[in-house]
Regions:
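N-terminal secretory signal peptides that target proteins for export/translocation
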Residues: 1-9
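Bacterial N-terminal signal peptides
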Residues: 11-22
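Sec/Tat signal peptide C-region and signal peptidase I cleavage site
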Residues: 24-29
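Central antiparallel beta-sheet cores of small beta-barrel/beta-sandwich binding domains
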Residues: 31-139, 150-169
Length: 169
């Protein structure tokens, strides 16, 4: 019986340590400001879905600069394909889970506001302009990131953009 009791105590100690490390890891992950996960340069490829139903392969580069106590972000996402290009820039602020800021897209001369939420590794943002609304979902897992942009404007020549990126620095 003494051996059996020692095994039970050892299992309990291992379980307690595992629980302590998982809680510590979770609280550490929650302390990381959402923009910190994005910082750096990224590149990859994806597709643009055009309003006529066709798809075009694109290559993309993204740069994220985190500023002022990890609550401000400047981003640039440039993508190019054979016929469709875009150059998206934004400045965003983060506070208590909420994201707000401004965006511009130079090849179409469009600009407007962004608003949304950050939850862990996921950003869900709505970009608005005078006659344009799009949703942007950005998910980061370590050195990988997916970006999906969907136009809510039926007149837009681009319906959706889907890009997978890898951190380069």
């Amino acid at each position: 019986m003494p051996l059996r009791g020692a095994i039970v105590v050892m299992r309990g100690a291992i379980l307690a340590m595992a629980l302590a490390f998982s809680v510590a890891g979770t609280s550490y992950a929650q302390r990381i400001a959402p923009f910190d996960r994005l910082a750096g340069n990224w590149s990859g490829s994806g597709t643009i879905e055009l309003s006529n139903g066709s798809h075009e392969t694109i290559r993309c580069r993204a740069a994220y600069d985190v500023l002022r106590e990890h609550s401000k972000l400047q981003l640039s996402i440039r993508c190019a394909g054979e016929g469709a290009n875009f150059d998206l820039r934004a400045n965003a602020d983060y506070s208590a889970g909420a994201i707000s800021g401004y965006w511009s897209e130079s090849s179409r001369g469009a600009s407007g506001t962004i608003s949304g939420r950050a939850d862990g590794d996921r950003f869900q943002v709505v970009a608005r302009a005078a006659s344009f609304v799009a949703t942007l979902t950005l998910v980061t897992h370590g050195g990988r990131q997916s970006v999906t942009i969907r136009s809510q404007d039926p007149q837009s020549t681009i319906k959706a953009v889907s890009v997978n990126l890898r951190r380069t620095s």
